[in-house]
Amino acid sequence: MLLALTGWLASCSHVATEEQVRSAELPPEGVPPQRVVIGVEQQKMVIFDWKKPKKMYPVSTSKFGLGNQPGSWNTPVGQMEVVKVIGKGLVPGSRLKARQPTGEVVPVNAPGRDAIVTRVLILKGAEKGNANTRQRFIYIHGTPAEDKLESPASWGCIRMASTDIIELCEWLRPGARVDVVPGRLPPPDDLPN
């Protein structure tokens, strides 16, 4: 990108304006700058910056399978959007209940603990089939049950290790696109439209 920008600037007979430099740094039309894709078969999440893979994380989706029915405890599939990030600044393992910190810190792999911890990404469905995602309280969130990552173990949400969701939330902004695909993670050129 820098070489293209440098070449573009060199070809100009005038000094580039700040607006011209900003527009040269924008992604191609229709490519979301931040994107999260979750491959349920592999129990992995890949984050993309302008269709370029940035990082992969282990996740855990629902132990009850995939679907969009209220009360099913299924992980919804399809396109969604991050609406809000909750918990910035909380220490790893900080328990959240009703999207509010409780003051309790749950240790990693604490026996019998199945809490929402560290950060919560509130999602809304962007398709007819998953439009109820927000009303179903389906989130991407931290889990103390890190020993269950890479296997379906959640009650519908997408779980991550506390250190991973902290890192994700440092990069991700509201408005980022999230795709949950039932199969394997697609290559970048085959991402859902």
Q: Where do the language-model regions lie?
A:
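Electropositive
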Residues: P58-I86, L90
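Exported/periplasmic cell-wall-interacting domains
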Residues: L26, V31, Q69-G71, L90-N193
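Soluble periplasmic/extracytoplasmic beta-strand elements of cell-envelope proteins
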Residues: R35-G39, K44-V46, P58-S60, E81-V83, ...
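A structural motif detector for short, solvent-exposed N-terminal "entry" segments of globular domains
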Residues: S23-L66
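A generic structural signal for short beta-strands and their flanking turns/coil linkers
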Residues: K55, P76-M80, V117-R119, R136
